[in-house]
Amino acid sequence: MSIVQLDHVSVTFKRKKAADVQAVQDVTLHIEKGDIYGIVGFSGAGKSTLVRTINLLQKPTAGDVVVGGVDFVKDGKQVISGKDLQARRRKIGMIFQQFNLLNETTVIENIAFALKHSDLSDDELEEKCHKLLKLVDLEDKANAYPAQLSGGQQQRVAIARALANDPEILLSDEATSALDPQTTIQILDLLKKLNRELGLTIVLITHEMAAVKKIANKVAVMENGRVVENGNLRDVFLAPKAELTQKFVGGSLAVVDTLKSLNISLAENEALYQLVYSLNNVAKSIIIELYREVGVEASMLYGNVEVLADEPVGTLLVTVKGDADKQKVTLKFLSDEGVTVTELDERGNRL
């Protein structure tokens, strides 16, 4: 079930003395409950503008926005009341590149600030804040001030504050961009933990494909305000269609570069395949199994392993010798083994 539905959403900024800016153009995305949905693109692609339409920090000029089954926007017009929107926003947490902490208050006071309109007693409020600190591994920093914390610790405080009202959705807008690589990994691991333990749906805005690859299960690629490609992480990463996606991913380009360097020429009754498979599900040597089970000779030209959301995924480039019937049996065998097969020509183009 979709917890966020964006249908044909556009955002246009009107300017008096210059041409209008179309920041988001006709974007449709459906995000399922429990997804970690990565939205990736270069600076200025429209990612941050798009994610702000989910909680109406940015109102669309066209399209529909439905969150948690509640209509926010229809045909570019806000249909939810201000009071109801305020209530719904409490169920949509948000973190940013800048931590936006109150420097003159302690860590626990920063978290409590998000609960100032709650009905909790003082004791309940303190208990909840300590639980949130435990959740983000900062139990010993309750009385510290932001200036006494590292960047990663400050982002953990921001995450705890964003979780204060028990949101169903967390919007992460370039939340790791200001952090060093090791701290970035730690924050991404924390987001993955929150997704797993709380059932939290996360929308991850980033220009770093490695962040998406580490924790997301779905991804959309944006360019010039449009989504040029989207789908399951595995499908998009291992068989990218859009040119921009190929630049981000690099894997498809590696296959093409390999073929160019080898300058291969396929013989009669010889086919070239790209094989993609989960190493968790396919533990056997595919080339040996093809010879043993199908009786065809396969040669490996290229091999690579990517780790996508903790799943090791292998990519092989192989040639298979055999007549049309043998090729048909080969394709069926590979499909039955859970291998995704794409036939290529000698230049790496799909057939």
Swiss-Prot record:
<comment type="function">
    <text>Part of the ABC transporter complex MetNIQ involved in methionine import. Responsible for energy coupling to the transport system.</text>
</comment>
<feature type="domain" description="ABC transporter">
    <location>
        <begin position="4"/>
        <end position="249"/>
    </location>
</feature>
<dbReference type="Pfam" id="PF00005">
    <property type="entry name" value="ABC_tran"/>
</dbReference>
<dbReference type="Pfam" id="PF09383">
    <property type="entry name" value="NIL"/>
</dbReference>
<protein>
    <recommendedName>
        <fullName>Methionine import ATP-binding protein MetN</fullName>
        <ecNumber>7.4.2.11</ecNumber>
    </recommendedName>
</protein>
<keyword id="KW-1003">Cell membrane</keyword>
<keyword id="KW-0472">Membrane</keyword>
<keyword id="KW-0547">Nucleotide-binding</keyword>
<dbReference type="InterPro" id="IPR017871">
    <property type="entry name" value="ABC_transporter-like_CS"/>
</dbReference>
<comment type="subunit">
    <text>The complex is composed of two ATP-binding proteins (MetN), two transmembrane proteins (MetI) and a solute-binding protein (MetQ).</text>
</comment>
<keyword id="KW-0067">ATP-binding</keyword>
<dbReference type="InterPro" id="IPR050086">
    <property type="entry name" value="MetN_ABC_transporter-like"/>
</dbReference>
<dbReference type="InterPro" id="IPR003439">
    <property type="entry name" value="ABC_transporter-like_ATP-bd"/>
</dbReference>
<dbReference type="GO" id="GO:0005886">
    <property type="term" value="C:plasma membrane"/>
</dbReference>
<feature type="binding site">
    <location>
        <begin position="41"/>
        <end position="48"/>
    </location>
    <ligand>
        <name>ATP</name>
    </ligand>
</feature>
<keyword id="KW-0029">Amino-acid transport</keyword>
<dbReference type="InterPro" id="IPR018449">
    <property type="entry name" value="NIL_domain"/>
</dbReference>
<dbReference type="GO" id="GO:0033232">
    <property type="term" value="F:ABC-type D-methionine transporter activity"/>
</dbReference>
<dbReference type="GO" id="GO:0016887">
    <property type="term" value="F:ATP hydrolysis activity"/>
</dbReference>
<keyword id="KW-1278">Translocase</keyword>
<dbReference type="InterPro" id="IPR027417">
    <property type="entry name" value="P-loop_NTPase"/>
</dbReference>
<dbReference type="GO" id="GO:0005524">
    <property type="term" value="F:ATP binding"/>
</dbReference>
<dbReference type="InterPro" id="IPR003593">
    <property type="entry name" value="AAA+_ATPase"/>
</dbReference>
<dbReference type="InterPro" id="IPR045865">
    <property type="entry name" value="ACT-like_dom_sf"/>
</dbReference>
<comment type="similarity">
    <text>Belongs to the ABC transporter superfamily. Methionine importer (TC 3.A.1.24) family.</text>
</comment>
<keyword id="KW-0813">Transport</keyword>
